[in-house]
Curated annotation (Swiss-Prot):
It comes from the Bacteria. Keywords: Cell inner membrane, Cell membrane, Membrane, Transmembrane, Transmembrane helix. The keyword Cell membrane applies. Disruption phenotype: Mutants show a slight decrease in the internalization level of some proline-rich antimicrobial peptides of eukaryotic origin. The chain crosses the membrane at residues 5-25, 65-85, 98-118. Residues 1-4, 86-97 are periplasmic. Coiled coil: none annotated. The lineage of its organism: Bacteria, Pseudomonadati, Pseudomonadota, Gammaproteobacteria, Enterobacterales. The gene is ygdD. This is UPF0382 inner membrane protein YgdD.
Length: 131
């Protein structure tokens, strides 16, 4: 995933987040139960946080190419699609099959954050000042 693609993914994910949040608040909340709306809300929260993380990685990749940040963004994007997407599908369809996809997305999130940590640790320090 290039930083251009990461920015495009973040823009699309952010758009979907806002659109689904508004649709959920104004339409779905009138037709869905509390459990389903909870699934939607959880999906939206995780999508928002991870979209911002992907955006941050894209900006970091503009300054310095890092294989660790590259793979971090891949796993965070995959986690967003699988975790949040499966919660949306579960809420809208009630097919329990989606409940098995959600943890795969969660593991993808964890891998993405771990890779980001490794990438951050491996960054070279620029002129450390001891003033």
């Amino acid at each position: 995933m290039t930083s251009r693609f990461m920015l495009i993914f973040a823009a699309i994910s952010g758009f979907i987040f806002v659109a689904l949040g508004a649709f959920g608040a104004h339409v779905l909340s009138k037709t869905m139960g509390a459990v389903e709306m909870g699934w939607i809300q959880t999906g939206l929260e995780y999508q928002a946080f991870h979209t911002l993380a992907i955006l941050g990685l894209a900006v970091a990749m503009q300054r310095r190419i890092s294989i660790w940040f590259y793979w971090s963004s891949v796993f965070l994007a995959l986690g967003t699609v699988l975790f949040s997407g499966s919660l949306y599908c579960l809420a809208l369809s009630h097919l329990r099959l989606w409940a098995f996809v959600t943890p795969v997305g969660g593991v993808s999130f964890l891998a993405g954050w771990a890779l980001m940590l490794v990438g951050a640790i491996r960054l070279k320090r620029k002129g450390v000042s001891h003033e």
